[in-house]
Amino acid sequence: MNRRNISAFNQQATGKADTLYMDNKEFERALAQVVLGQPTAFKSDSAMVLLESQFKFQSEKHKQANLAWLEQNKKLKGIKTLPSGLQYRVLTEGTGPVATDSSEVEVHYEGSLLDGTEFDSSNTRQQPDTFRQNKIIKGWREALTMMPEGAGWNLSIPSYLGYGERGSGQQIPGNSTLIFKVECLKVKNNPAKK
């Protein structure tokens, strides 16, 4: 049976120092009751400890799965891995200037999660976006200072170079690796020569 180990919960709920185990159905029933504001077999403080513990467990599990994916991805032909952990594959060579920290960059891009869920796309909007180089996530900032105008790259951005443990809104969970297909259309304001 698939069981969930909720450490420290039993201490809060019953005063006993051992660990409580709940199967999936029990956990889902208790979670639904808490969300709906219905009475549960747990004290409200204990229910919060249960939820926090479960979310931390799931977040760590998600983080480890994403790190394992990056380890496998870097072995693929054509993937380059930088010391920071950023991974990229050149799709189209560019010949123009590259961005500096004070540049603005006009790009077309598609962003997705490892499961293929697309969370943003300038291509869908049929309108390129312009970003200030110093106002974007670290993974993009690093890539765009190496990516010449006219280039197209696939980026695999570890969570610590993206949105970290917190994620971003409802679409990007914490500890998510971000996959981007980026086309650098124009480097504006203080470009560096390649």
Predicted regions mapped to residue ranges:
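Cross-family detector of peptidyl-prolyl cis-trans isomerase
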Residues: 1-194
